[in-house]
Curated annotation (Swiss-Prot):
GO terms for molecular function: (4S)-4-hydroxy-2-oxoglutarate aldolase activity; (R,S)-4-hydroxy-2-oxoglutarate aldolase activity; 4-hydroxy-4-methyl-2-oxoglutarate aldolase activity; metal ion binding; oxaloacetate decarboxylase activity. This is 4-hydroxy-4-methyl-2-oxoglutarate aldolase/4-carboxy-4-hydroxy-2-oxoadipate aldolase. Its EC number is 4.1.3.16, 4.1.3.17, 4.1.1.112. It comes from Pseudomonas straminea. Pfam families: RraA-like (PF03737). Homohexamer. Optimum pH varies depending on the substrate used and phosphate concentration. In the absence of inorganic phosphate pH optima are 6.6 for L-4-carboxy-4-hydroxy-2-oxoadipate, 8.0 for D-4-carboxy-4-hydroxy-2-oxoadipate, 6.7 and 8.0 for DL-4-carboxy-4-hydroxy-2-oxoadipate, 8.3 for DL-4-hydroxy-4-methyl-2-oxoglutarate, 9.3 for DL-4-hydroxy-2-oxoglutarate and 8.8 for oxaloacetate. Substrate binds at G97, D98, L99, L100, R119. Its cofactor is Mg(2+).
Length: 227
């Protein structure tokens, strides 16, 4: 059950080195390394392309059409955090724009992940403040109803607990549980190393058919070549 009207000020953040290190590996590699779990729904898209970030989650539960708690959340941000926001019911209003981004950026936030709408996207890009959202909308919000900050939330279908690691890029958004951050970093680095070896073989002209030993199972499945 959601707690409303609360702010947890002391949260256990994931290991900082692990949280920082996952950015370079990207969402797809991290998702695979975790066993293909942790992925937010694919409608969560960056408002502009080219950013690849990771950081520890400060979570926000919002009410439809009301961004009051985003201002409350700003106070809880520490350098290296990513704000993750969910809404109690579906809403695409523009909860976040350049003024809140200025506040978040001053506190050290690396990004915002919000299962709702944002606006001022041109200015946000000029500010180099990345956002992943499900909508872009000029429609503003009010400030009247309490939500909560730093409670477990479900954002775009994924449970996010305060302090978890968020990895986001052009391919999507992944949540890594804080307790698994170090383990997942090691697994993702190992996977990246293997992919580097495969990439070199493919670049040399080796076919995936041979590298992955696909020919025999394809033949057994009934594939026929016709000249």
């Amino acid at each position: 059950m959601y707690e409303l009207g609360v702010v947890y000020r002391n949260i256990q953040r994931a290991d900082r080195a692990a949280a920082d290190g996952l950015a370079a590996l990207g969402s797809a590699t991290v998702h695979e390394a975790m066993g293909r779990v942790g992925l937010l729904k694919p409608y969560m898209r960056p408002i502009y392309a080219g950013k690849q970030v990771s950081g520890t989650a400060v979570t926000v539960l919002l009410q439809p059409g009301d961004n009051w708690m985003m201002h409350v959340a700003a106070e809880q941000i520490q350098p290296g955090d990513i704000v993750v926001a969910a809404v109690t019911a579906e809403c695409t209003d523009g909860y976040f724009g350049d003024l809140l981004a200025t506040s978040f950026q001053a506190r050290g936030a690396r990004a915002l992940i919000i299962d709702a709408g944002v606006r001022d996207v041109k200015t946000l890009q000029e500010m180099d403040f990345p956002v992943w959202s499900k909508a872009i909308s000029s429609k503003g919000t009010i400030k009247a109803t309490l939500g909560s900050v730093n409670i477990p939330i479900v954002c775009a279908g994924m449970l996010v607990t305060p302090g978890d690691v968020i990895v986001a890029d052009d391919d999507g958004v992944v949540c890594v549980p804080a307790a698994r951050a170090v383990e997942v970093l090691a697994a993702a680095q190992k996977r990246e190393s293997f992919e580097g070896e495969k990439r070199a073989k493919l670049a040399s002209g080796v076919l995936g058919l041979d590298m992955y030993k696909m020919r025999e199972p394809l033949e057994k499945a009934g594939l026929k070549y016709i000249d």
